[in-house]
A protein has these predicted regions:
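Active-site loop segments of alpha/beta catalytic cores
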Residues: 1-35, 98-349
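Compositionally biased, low-complexity repeat tracts
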Residues: 2, 18, 30, 56-57, ...
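Short, basic/low-complexity N-terminal boundary segments at the transition from targeting/disordered tails
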Residues: 30-50
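Short aromatic-enriched loop/helix-cap "lid" or pocket-rim segments at secondary-structure transitions
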Residues: 41-44, 59, 74-76, 82-83, ...
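Short acidic, Pro/Gly- and aromatic-enriched capping/linker segments at domain boundaries
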Residues: 45-63
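A contiguous, low-structure linker/loop signature
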Residues: 59-106, 126-133
Length: 349
C-alpha cells in the first residue's frame, strides 16, 4: 500500500474499484447499496436496478414482476420480504401456469437507465465520484423461496430438481433479456449478484445441490461482468464460506456482508486481496446491549479492520438496523461510522 500514499487523493469510486481489482488503494472503502437521504458526500458504490424490476421496492412494497407481494417491517426500517403465508406457487410441476414473465414491449431503456443515474447524482453521488453497480434481483434461490415459501421450495429442490431447473432457466432468460436491453446504457463499473442461500448456522442446501441447481444461473448472469471486464460482487448473508470457491470459479471478486459466522481468516489466507471481504463485522453479542460503550463500539470496528484489511482486499460493510428514527440505533451507527471514517482512513498510512 505504501507506494500510493502521498499521491493525489483518490475518489471514493477510484478507491473502491482499486480495492475490488486487488490494487493498491488509499483507505478502507465503505460498501453501500447507494446514498441515503441526508447524505452530502459521494458514496463508494451506487447499486442500479432497472425500474421495471424494482418498482415495488421504490414504492415501499407491493407486487414484484412475478406477482409476489412484498411487505415491509417497522423493526427493520421498512426492509421488504415476501408476505408470509401468501405464496403464489404450491406445486413446482405447475410453474408454467403461474410464473409469467412481464412484457418488455415499449420500454425506453436509455431513459430508464438515465433516470436512475440522475437520482444518484441528485443525492450527491454522481458517477464520476461513485461507482455504479448493476443488479437485477434477489437471487435464483431467493426467487424460488419467494414463489413457494421455504418449506415447499426446499421440498421442490429435493423432489423435483428438473422442474426447478426449468423454472430457474426461464427466469434467468428473462433477467438476461432485461440486462441485454439496458446494461450498455448503464455502463456499470461493477456487476452485483445476490442470493441469500444460508442461515447464520449453515447453508439451506448442500454444496452439491447449490452447484447443480443454483450456480449455473449465476454463472450465466456473471457472464455480463466477465465479458465487460468489470468486477463482480456477490451478496449472500449467513454461513456460506463453503461456496466461496464456486463464486470465484464464475468470476466473483468480492462478498458482502461476509458475516463473522464464517471462517473469514481462512478465506483471507487462501485468496489474499484477490477476493474482497466486504463485512467481517456483525451487530451481535455485547454490541446489542443497551449499556455498550462508545469505546466498545469503536474497538469492534478496529478489530474487524485489523483482522481483514491489513493487506487490502477489505471493505467496511456493517451497521445497526432498527425502526426509522430509533435514537439508540442512530447513536450506535454514528459512532461506528465515525470510527470507520477515522481509523479506516489512516490504516494504510
Amino acid at each position: 500500500m505504501a507506494e500510493i500514499i502521498g499521491k493525489a487523493h483518490l475518489t471514493e469510486k477510484e478507491n473502491y474499484l482499486r480495492t475490488l481489482r486487488g490494487q493498491d488503494h488509499e483507505f478502507v472503502p465503505t460498501y453501500t447499496f447507494g446514498p441515503m437521504p441526508g447524505m452530502t458526500e459521494p458514496v463508494a458504490n451506487c447499486m442500479l436496478e432497472p425500474e421495471i424490476l424494482v418498482e415495488f421496492r421504490m414504492n415501499g412494497g407491493g407486487l414484484d414482476p412475478w406477482g409476489v407481494n412484498y411487505v415491509g417491517t417497522t423493526e427493520t426500517a421498512g426492509a421488504l420480504l415476501p408476505e408470509p403465508g401468501n405464496f403464489i406457487l404450491d406445486d413446482i410441476t405447475k410453474w408454467h401456469d403461474v410464473i409469467k414473465a412481464p412484457s418488455l414491449e415499449g420500454i425506453d431503456w436509455e431513459a430508464m437507465a438515465q433516470r436512475s443515474l440522475d437520482r444518484f447524482a441528485a443525492m450527491g453521488s454522481p458517477r464520476d465520484q461513485s461507482a455504479v453497480s448493476f443488479n437485477m434481483h434477489v437471487g435464483y434461490f431467493q426467487n424460488l423461496m419467494a414463489f413457494m415459501g421455504f418449506e415447499e421450495g426446499l421440498c421442490a429442490m429435493s423432489e423435483e430438481p428438473e422442474e426447478v431447473k426449468a423454472l430457474l432457466s426461464y427466469i434467468c432468460d428473462f433477467y438476461m433479456e432485461v440486462a441485454n436491453h439496458i446494461i450498455d446504457y448503464v455502463q456499470p463499473d461493477v456487476l452485483t449478484m445476490m442470493d441469500d442461500v444460508a442461515t447464520w448456522r449453515a447453508p439451506f442446501i448442500s454444496k452439491d445441490m447449490f452447484e447443480e441447481l443454483i450456480l449455473p444461473w449465476h454463472n450465466i448472469q456473471a457472464s455480463l461482468g466477465r465479458e465487460r471486464g468489470i468486477p463482480i460482487t456477490m451478496h449472500c448473508c449467513g454461513h456460506a464460506d463453503n461456496l466461496v470457491d464456486d463464486w470465484v470459479s464464475i468470476g466473483v471478486n468480492a462478498w458482502d456482508p461476509a458475516q463473522t459466522c464464517n471462517d473469514l481468516k481462512g478465506v483471507k489466507a487462501k485468496y489474499g486481496n484477490k477476493f474482497v471481504i466486504m463485512g467481517g463485522w456483525d451487530s451481535v453479542g455485547r454490541l446489542l446491549e443497551k449499556d455498550v460503550t462508545e469505546e466498545e463500539l469503536r474497538l469492534s470496528v478496529r478489530e474487524s479492520m485489523d483482522n481483514y484489511a491489513y493487506d487490502g482486499g477489505y471493505c467496511w460493510c456493517g451497521g445497526f438496523l432498527g425502526p426509522i428514527g430509533d435514537e439508540e440505533c442512530m447513536r450506535k451507527n454514528n459512532i461506528i461510522m465515525d470510527e470507520v471514517n477515522t481509523y479506516g482512513r489512516t490504516l494504510y498510512k
